[in-house]
Amino acid sequence: MPVAKPLDLPFDPIERAAEIWGDRFGPADAMAAVTSIMRAQQILLGGLDGLLRPYGLTFARYEALVLLAFSRRGTLPLRVIGERLMVHPTSVTNTVDRLERDGLVRRRPNPRDGRGTLAEITPSGRDVVTRSTADLMAARFGMAGYDPPELGEIFTLLRGLRVSAGDFTPEPGAAAVSAPVTPPSAIRRRR
């Protein structure tokens, strides 16, 4: 899988930052974890976007297409796409604009809501989803260095963060959630 441009440093900059942080501010475990997650996101997104580039997609556009492909009728209101992908309505509009321009989706009026708009995946869009997904699966979504139990651990740890942030309420009996994090709203109030 293509990856972000390697930094090729002779040391781990996050580990070094954690050492300095510890000397100046105190415990660095949370800072090092968050910085590692942010860097991992950059690496993964760069690699995934590189795999999807031959299809004229970014990972954000791919997610929207897959969401439409998953829907029973191949259509969803733009509002629902935004909710499911957890993005701002403007981002959904821009994503659908590009997909429509490329002939992968089309807009049509929502018959249940006279003001709303549906995005509908086209046959070309379904074909692109099938082919691009095969490439992502072959690359294991950039996570080929991890075995299934490790991927499960990563999912569970990050799921706890998402639950604590209020992304969703887990169903009773769902997998255990890791330690809670400070929700973004509480961080904003402290400033």
Feature-to-residue mapping (PLM):
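Amphipathic alpha-helices that form helix-helix packing interfaces
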Residues: 40, 44, 132, 154-157, ...
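N-terminal helix-turn-helix DNA-binding core of bacterial DNA-binding proteins
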Residues: 28, 38, 42, 46-88, ...
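N-terminal leader segment of winged-helix/HTH proteins
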Residues: 1-55
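C-terminal regulatory/oligomerization modules of transcriptional regulators
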Residues: 1-25, 149-191
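Short amphipathic alpha-helical segments with heptad-repeat character
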Residues: 34, 38, 42, 86, ...
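Charged, amphipathic alpha-helical coiled-coil/dimerization segments
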Residues: 97-156
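Short, flexible, glycine-rich and Lys/Arg-enriched loop motifs at helix boundaries
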Residues: 15-26, 71-74, 138-144
